[in-house]
Amino acid sequence: MFIDVAKIELKAGKGGDGSVAFRREKYEPSGGPAGGDGGDGGSIIIVGDKDIKTLMDYSYRSIYKAESGGDGRNKKQFGKKGEDLILKVPVGTLVKDYDTDTVIYDVKHDKEEFVICKGGKGGKGNVHFKSSIRQAPRFAEPGEKGEEKTIKLELKLLADVGLIGLPNVGKSTLLSIMSNARPKIANYHFTTLEPNLGVCKVGEKSFVLADIPGLIEGASEGLGLGHDFLKHIERTKILVHVLDISGSEGRNPIEDFELINSELSSYNIKLNDKKMLVVLNKTDLGAEDNIKEFREKYSDKVDEIVEISAATTENVDKLMYLIADTLDSIEDDYSTLDEQYVYFEEEKEPDFKVRRENENYIVEGPLIENLIYRTNFEVYESVNHLQKVLEDKGVIQQLKDLGIQDGDNVVIGDVEFDFYE
């Protein structure tokens, strides 16, 4: 089993700013406020996709941003909503908080959606701030910031394809050509002790390929590391049996084929039910007679026979597309992950907290901090609106309960100001 991991930074779109505007009609030169609202920022949505098998696409980019909302306009026109950003991931992907490693979401189904970062709300235009005592408000709200997160995508890969065959038939070379893996390649027997895994991309599709360590006679009885090797084969969807059809090391490819198949059957008879593609490798070394003999004997007994040369890459592309098409014909099974996960659920916190620290009175909480962010301190009416909301929410009363006096320092988010009633 192999863990595919990707770290990505996410930034949802900022909400558009509300507009400060007034009606200017021909017969109404002193019309009322007409500033429209800003559009909401785009959210970032994670979607499960059964056709994606790996996290390979997230190795090329690390930062993803959704579109911001458009600003409000005159005549009460709303700004354009920012477009949501869709991130497709394989079914079975765990979405984790990067810093705490806690599970935020487990993508279990095809087309399942989860909003990982919500876009900021658009700011209200000045049309919303008209009142009996404020007929021409000259302020509007800025848009909210979008949510930001750094997450880790984690996918447990069970190899889709198992490369099997005796040592030195060219499996490691083939894996390195077909995928992003860089296995150690040496011309001696039994060198690989763990499966080398590679991710292969064919057009828009991808699959995981495992070079199963070289099997030997007696593997089904545990000789060498037989049982350890064979257990990896059980988890694959299809087998690709690689043969040195040239017999370059003095071996008979037909005898080799029968030996490996015998070991598979002895270990687990169900392995005979797996789809098997047979790859006749090293055709560049001259193997016409062996190819003819093999095809005559096995054409009607195996799913496909492909002639290739890993050394010259002849027909390797053909093999990759054949594997991808074969995998498409096999129903996916997502029941392989039976671990229990502890999910992280955010506790609902109060809208704000007020505390005293030395000579400062500190107000904390996303609702109040966002209100500060959306206040234009250059405009008296905007500041006056802020003060009214702080009173309505009970912030002013809690500050008084802590003993605040005129002239004392108040800190909300990144903003500091003196308190005066």
Curated annotation (Swiss-Prot):
Organism per entry: Finegoldia magna (strain ATCC 29328 / DSM 20472 / WAL 2508)
Cofactor: Mg(2+)
Record-given protein name: GTPase Obg
Any GO MF annotation of the entry: GTP binding
Function description: An essential GTPase which binds GTP, GDP and possibly (p)ppGpp with moderate affinity, with high nucleotide exchange rates and a fairly low GTP hydrolysis rate. Plays a role in control of the cell cycle, stress response, ribosome biogenesis and in those bacteria that undergo differentiation, in morphogenesis control.
Sequence ranges assigned to domain OCT in this UniProt record: 344-421
A GO cellular component entry from the record: cytoplasm
Binding positions for Mg(2+) per the UniProt entry: 172, 192
InterPro entries noted in UniProt: G_OBG (IPR031167), GTP-bd (IPR006073), GTP-bd_Obg/CgtA (IPR014100), GTP-bd_prot_GTP1/OBG_C_sf (IPR036346), GTP1-OBG_CS (IPR006074), GTP1_OBG_dom (IPR006169), GTP1_OBG_dom_sf (IPR036726), OBG_GTPase (IPR045086)
Domain OBG-type G as annotated: residue spans: 159-328
UniProt-listed PANTHER family: DEVELOPMENTALLY REGULATED GTP-BINDING PROTEIN-RELATED, MITOCHONDRIAL RIBOSOME-ASSOCIATED GTPASE 2
Residues at which GTP binds: 165-172, 190-194, 211-214, 281-284, 309-311
